[in-house]
Every structure is written in structure tokens, then in C-alpha cells.
Amino acid sequence: MKLRWFAFLIVLLAGCSSKHDYTNPPWNAKVPVQRAMQWMPISQKAGAAWGVDPQLITAIIAIESGGNPNAVSKSNAIGLMQLKASTSGRDVYRRMGWSGEPTTSELKNPERNISMGAAYLNILETGPLAGIEDPKVLQYALVVSYANGAGALLRTFSSDRKKAISKINDLDADEFLEHVARNHPAPQAPRYIYKLEQALDAM
């Protein structure tokens, strides 16, 4: 009986540790970042328009599409920043005071895609993530929310947005990453932060 319990404990611990091993397999950011950097003039323009760091935009391009403006995912996320017309695209249109949602050809246009991606990051920062004080924590929260939705992130802290933001403000960047690794329902969430750091280091 003791041996059986010990074996179960080993399996349980292995499962727990693997959940947080978001750095495997290693991601080499060099080539994706090089390809994303060709769009830096557009990223700088969009970043200035929406108050978003162009390096953050470039990192997201490297992670999401590897710099390919024609990239389309299985979930129909399109273009350099992998925007979905019916979700993030619609949110940006609403912010601009427009009806409907962007077309596929619009999302494959590098300038339009990057502009809308920057606008969506601004929507996240000034909306559901408003009030996060630490710049690095905010950066991490932005990319996790960009990839998996702000609601999913905030609910790992509290069902009340203000309480969630308050709890986030009690954490430094490393503590925030550990919280995401332990509590976020999407296993790719902490890996996105890992890829972000790899991309920023490669610039």
C-alpha cells in the first residue's frame, strides 16, 4: 500500500512540475524577431498613435506570425498580429466608432493589421487591465490577455475586476508569472510570457 501511494505521489508531483515547465521546448526567437523587425517602421507609427511600445508590438508579431503577413491560424486568426475579425477586430472597430468587423484582406494588410493590433492592446490597457501599476507586470498581463483574453486572467485573481487588479498590484513580475503558471487555465499563457522575454532579448 505504501509503495502504491509513493508511486502515485511521484506521478502527481511530476504532473505538477510539468505544468509549470513552460520553457520547454525551447523557443529560438532570433529568426522570428528578424522577420518581425522589417515591420518596425509601421510598429513605431502604430505604437505612437495608440501609446504602445513598438518593441512589444514587434515581439507579438514575432510570436504570433513570425513576421508573415499572410499567416492564418486554425482558429482563423489572421495576419502579422493574428487578429480574429469577430473578436479583437470587432472590438477595435467599435473603439473607432465603426460597425461590423475587418475583412480578411484588411487583416492581411501589414499596416492595417499592426494598427488594429496596437489599438487592441490599448483597449486592454485602458479597459480591463486599467490600474496595473508595475510596467513589467502590465506588459505580462497585456500579452496574456492578448492571447487568451483579459477575463480569463483576471478571474484567476478574483471575479471582481477591482479586487483582481488590487491583487495583481501586490505582485512583482516574477510573482505574477508564477501565479499565471500555477493558476491560468491555458497552459500557453506562461509560455507566452517566456516567448515575450526571448523576443525582447533578441532585439
From Swiss-Prot:
The keyword Cell wall biogenesis/degradation applies. The N-terminus is blocked. It is an enzyme of class 4 (lyase). Keywords: Cell outer membrane, Cell wall biogenesis/degradation, Lipoprotein, Lyase, Membrane, Palmitate, Signal. HAMAP family: EmtA. The gene is emtA. This is Endo-type membrane-bound lytic murein transglycosylase A. InterPro entries: EmtA, Lysozyme-like_dom_sf, Transglyc_AS, Transglycosylase_SLT_dom_1.
